[in-house]
A protein has these predicted regions:
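Hydrophobic alpha-helical bundles in membrane proteins
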Residues: 1-155
């Protein structure tokens, strides 16, 4: 479980640092195949330190779980602290409107047609949707860890 978390943290970090353009949409524009990344690549490159911090926090959190071997109070504290820092950094990073590639939305319209108001709105707000999912997952992770740490510390 902890090893999978470490692997995921490393993969996330590498993908966003090395090839963030992999998350893209493909469409045909004027007879030419075009690939538009979801995120603004320049912003991603400028904020590489956020991505590195997310990776370090994830590896640190999972490493403590791996070293301790069970849900201890130390694991609980490390999880809460790293998730709070992770959440704060994620809010700062994802709420910047520069993160989204404006050309991506043109690709959505090209792909689905101009009458795709709902789809366009979802993608225009994607950074906020993505943020909500991440904050929700961090919250669930904290709650699960606290419950398990308290449960196993009584035994």
């Amino acid at each position: 479980d902890a090893i999978i978390g470490i692997v995921f943290s490393v993969i996330f970090t590498l993908v966003f640092l090395v090839c963030p353009q992999i998350v893209c949409i493909a469409f045909v524009k004027n007879g030419v195949s075009v690939y538009e990344p979801l995120f603004n690549l320049e912003y991603i490159r400028q904020t590489w330190y956020f991505i590195l911090a997310f990776g370090i926090l994830g590896v640190a959190r999972e490493s403590v779980r791996l070293i301790d071997g069970s849900y201890t109070k130390r694991v609980m504290l490390v999880t809460i602290i790293t998730n709070l820092i992770d959440g704060a950094l994620t809010i700062i990073w994802l709420l910047n409107d520069k993160i989204m590639n404006p050309n991506f939305f043109e690709g959505i319209e090209q792909l689905f047609g101009e009458n795709t108001e709902v789809i366009s709105q979802v993608f225009i707000q994607f950074n906020k949707v993505f943020l909500a999912i991440i904050i929700f997952a961090l919250g669930i992770n904290c709650i699960e860890t606290v419950i398990k740490a308290l449960k196993y510390s009584r035994k």
